[in-house]
Amino acid sequence: MNVGIVARKGNDEAVATALDVYEAARDHGETVWVDEETASSLASEAGSPTVPGRPVAALAACDLAVAIGGDGTFLFVARNAGDTPVLGINLGEVGFLNAVPPASATAAVRSALDGLADGDLSVREAPRLVARTDEWESVPAANEIVVHGDRRGPGSGIEYELAVDDSQYSTGRADGVLVATPTGSTAYNLSERGPLVAPDVDGLVVNEMAARTGM
């Protein structure tokens, strides 16, 4: 199997954990690589083995992606991984998405590889959002899509109309409108006083940002 590892930039603990995970997956018999910046960091350390580095875009062709850092690192990996399952090693303060502590990283990777080999890997599928117009389309977003005006505050904002399945649901004026996945309910949505939603809920959050009128 092909395993790609991405570590948080500029973090010595992330680089060290990446090396541990690399060696665990390699000893498991897999083809393993790390992101180019982590490979460069390892190459500069005396006594470190030569570890192959690849662009993060190569994650989409992997059987397993490993994100080492905080939620930002996890989301960065998810944007590049396509349908590849992502295992998160948490080095951040919160870690809503990265569930595995560094001390359990190698054991978690070996368990995931065993699950993939046996065809019984337990995964949680997370929805992603795409914004689309006649002229462009966004990359898939794991957290949220936000529509807003040029600036926020008094005298600014947008008039909006919200439709669901081509039927008008609401109109109003606000600084903007945010649509979040359950995963994203813990991010920007929460700072805009939106609700927390359990990851397994089949739905989306629609949140007015500093609304002038209620939905």
Write out the residue ranges for each language-model feature.
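Short glycine/serine/threonine-rich phosphate/pyrophosphate-binding segments
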Residues: A14-V15, G72-V77, T171, T186-L190
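N-terminal glycine-rich "phosphate-gripper" loop used for MgATP/nucleotide binding
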Residues: D63-D71, A78-N80
